[in-house]
Swiss-Prot record:
It is found in: Secreted. It comes from Ovis aries. Gene3D superfamilies: Cystine-knot cytokines (2.10.90.10). PROSITE patterns: PDGF_1, PDGF_2. The gene is PDGFB. PANTHER family: PLATELET-DERIVED GROWTH FACTOR (PTHR11633), PLATELET-DERIVED GROWTH FACTOR SUBUNIT B (PTHR11633:SF2). This is Platelet-derived growth factor subunit B. Its main location: secreted. One of its GO terms (cellular component) is cell surface. GO terms for biological process: cell chemotaxis; cellular response to mycophenolic acid; embryonic placenta development; heart development; metanephric glomerular mesangial cell development; monocyte chemotaxis; negative regulation of gene expression; negative regulation of phosphatidylinositol biosynthetic process.
Amino acid sequence: MNRCWALFLSLCCYLRLVSAEGDPIPEELYEMLSDHSIRSFDDLQRLLHGDSLDEDGAELDLNLTRSHSGGELESLSRGRRSLGSPTVAEPAVIAECKTRTEVSEISRRLIDRTNANFLVWPPCVEVQRCSGCCNNRNVQCRPTQVQDRKVQVKKIEIVRKKKIFKKATVTLVDHLACRCETVMARAVTRTPGSSQEQRAARTPQTRVTIRTVRVRRPPKGKHRKFKHTHDKTALKETLGA
């Protein structure tokens, strides 16, 4: 019993010393001391360590939130700087004339042109083709050496709703070497009358046949009064009179 009282007095002295030196003592601690829950020095240590752990946890959470918020703000500021600041453009490099890997489609015409009721597998393969640009517009990248390569594909026929697998051979063309070659333009010689002749040759001619239809008029009959007169001179004199 005396030990408990001594413990209680030492705790009160410690609390007063702490309140005088630092922050005020919370009222929750007084309530826990007034209660009979503290019966030994171990209970007091648990109480003090529990409060310190809670405070340390709160400080740790606060530090973490500050660090996260600071990191997010820093990342946002970096993002704004990167968006706002102009990016450094790298120099352009010409695509030189050389062989490159391209994708070529295997159509059904390469296997069988008479039948369309089948599938080809694989539908496309890789080939080597010349590509690139040259220094002049009059020069193009063209292959100087080619090689035929045979590949085996599957021909899947559908007969009476059943699949029949067959093998077929397709010949592919690979480019081995490339070079920029001059494009030869066709020489066009023009003569003074050639332009009109070329235009006449280009424009399609349509033949138009015109048929003249003669309409037969009924013969002019003489007046009944002058039927008996056959002499034209006498008839003219009679009409003139």
